[in-house]
């Protein structure tokens, strides 16, 4: 076995040890370990299961804490074990043992990289599920088809991540695509991953709806906001709400309810409107719409605070949800994020949900 390769492995383990120490401090390892012990104790209380919602929250918190604490524990023990295995492999000239060490160290590096990525999730709601509102801009069929393409892109991204998606509201376009839609994305750090997708998305392409095959520009807006659990208090005055019911519509007229089960809620002080029609029960749709409203009010408050903070920092641009964030030029095979400068040429892969590069660039640059 070459001494250079052995030294390289030992250097990798030393580097992992240093990075592990840094991330333990940054992520408050001891605090999270203590809290995990508390949460495990709570989960073992039989009384907890009398409150299914609370039990679900405890289970979710436990999973997030375990993802940090147990990973750091595994990295620490892995570093120590592999140092001993390297010594044994050298003494016994064990090529197979040495190959196993290289594979295991590569796995430790992957775990560390995943943890370091999670360091970028610095907002309280980052671990939460989220909602995505997609709305077609002006331009009729072109814009509605583009909104439908974005709807598919985010659905495919969620599937790639192993997330669960639920369509809460969908208003089909007259010819193609959608006029607007709201989807719920359920999964660990769904909001943290998707929050930087908020903004206006611009499409440039030769239109399939134009017999002259002219180049068209279309716009659609995306708004991502977190699902709020009971740990974050949002007070809503019932007097501030206007609640309307209407008949739910389905794609192509399918499964249309004959009762007014769909619910639209308007929060009059802010003008925020939410609607839900995915359930046949008006009561269930109203409950879902209220959860969406709480989440939107939370996101509005967070954005107000961020804007106030940015106003104090010279040179910071407005990153309100109305800002154009990304350009998709299909005939040139180019998709570029206007905030980070990140650019790719494989437009098909991106529209099929391969958003990791864009999301990572946005989080790294603190967008």
Curated annotation (Swiss-Prot):
N5-methylglutamine found at: 254
The keyword Nuclease is assigned to this record: no
Localization terms from the record: Cytoplasm
InterPro entries: PCRF, Pep_chain_release_fac_I, Pep_chain_release_fac_I_sf, PrfB
Keyword Protein biosynthesis part of the UniProt annotation: yes
Keywords per UniProt: Cytoplasm, Methylation, Protein biosynthesis
Listed GO MF terms: translation release factor activity, codon specific
UniProt-listed Pfam families: PCRF, RF-1
Chief subcellular location: cytoplasm
Disulfide pairings: none
GO CC terms of this entry: cytoplasm
SMART domains named among the record's database cross-references: PCRF
Post-translational modification note: Methylated by PrmC. Methylation increases the termination efficiency of RF2.
Functional description taken from the UniProt entry: Peptide chain release factor 2 directs the termination of translation in response to the peptide chain termination codons UGA and UAA.
Family that this chain belongs to: Belongs to the prokaryotic/mitochondrial release factor family.
PANTHER family named among the record's database cross-references: CLASS I PEPTIDE CHAIN RELEASE FACTOR (PTHR43116:SF3), PEPTIDE CHAIN RELEASE FACTOR 2 (PTHR43116)
HAMAP family, sorted: Rel_fac_2
Record's protein name: Peptide chain release factor 2
